[in-house]
Every structure is written in structure tokens, then in C-alpha cells.
């Protein structure tokens, strides 16, 4: 049986999507919930940002391999939609509240990842062109 050439990147993309779903829908342990209540900065927004920042890298590569015309734009839109759906699920199936800002933090994480990848690609091309 021959494994498709880009199977690993697609599998990694799926693994990140599943891991994010478990992380965001799983109830927060009461000890952790109580420990973070006094923190002024909303740590949950940082978690959403970081999860989608990391996941956007293989997602973008996977979409590029599939031939999506603008994989960066598609990743940001998909992250916003996926984050929104997860927030709805969180509000329906857990004791946690769905928050628009959590979805926005995830989309922003994906946007920053795409921006970093774009900057690295441009910088890499400039370096190659200079040689």
C-alpha cells in the first residue's frame, strides 16, 4: 500500500484540529478555574491565540498542498469558523460560556501565523535572490 506524498501534513493538520476541540470543549478543572480568576489578563484568550497560532502552520501547508488558491486567507477564515463552532459547542455542552473574544483570539492567532509564514517566505526569497 502506497502512502500519499503529503499524508503526514494532512494527518498533522487533523491531529491539531482534534486536539484543539478536546482542549476547548473539555471542562476546566475547578482548581484551575479558581486559580486563574484573580489574574487580570484573560489567560484563556492567550490559550486560544496560541493554539490556533501553532495549528495554522500545518493547516496552511495542507491547504496549499491541496491546491487552494489563497491558503493563508482560507486558514484564517477556517480558524474563525472553527473557533466559532467550538465556542457554540462549548456553550451547549459544558458549563463554560461561549465567548466571541475566544473565537477572535483564535482567528488572530491564525492570522499572525500566516503573517509570520509570509514574512519568512519573502525574507527567504530575498536571501536567495541576493546570492
Q: What would you call each of these model-derived segments?
A:
Residues 1-101, 107-131:
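Bulky hydrophobic segments
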Amino acid at each position: 500500500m502506497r502512502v500519499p506524498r503529503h499524508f503526514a501534513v494532512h494527518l498533522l493538520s487533523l491531529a491539531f484540529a482534534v486536539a484543539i476541540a478536546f482542549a476547548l470543549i473539555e471542562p476546566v478543572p475547578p482548581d484551575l478555574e479558581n486559580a486563574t480568576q484573580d489574574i487580570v489578563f484573560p489567560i484563556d484568550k492567550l490559550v486560544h491565540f496560541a493554539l490556533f497560532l501553532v495549528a495554522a502552520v500545518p493547516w496552511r501547508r495542507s491547504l496549499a498542498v491541496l491546491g487552494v488558491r489563497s491558503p493563508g486567507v482560507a486558514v484564517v477564515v477556517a480558524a474563525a469558523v472553527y473557533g466559532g463552532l467550538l465556542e457554540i459547542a462549548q456553550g451547549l455542552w459544558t458549563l463554560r460560556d461561549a465567548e466571541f473574544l475566544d473565537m477572535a483570539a483564535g482567528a488572530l492567532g491564525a492570522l499572525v501565523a500566516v503573517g509570520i509564514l509570509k514574512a519568512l517566505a519573502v525574507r527567504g526569497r530575498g536571501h536567495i535572490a541576493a546570492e
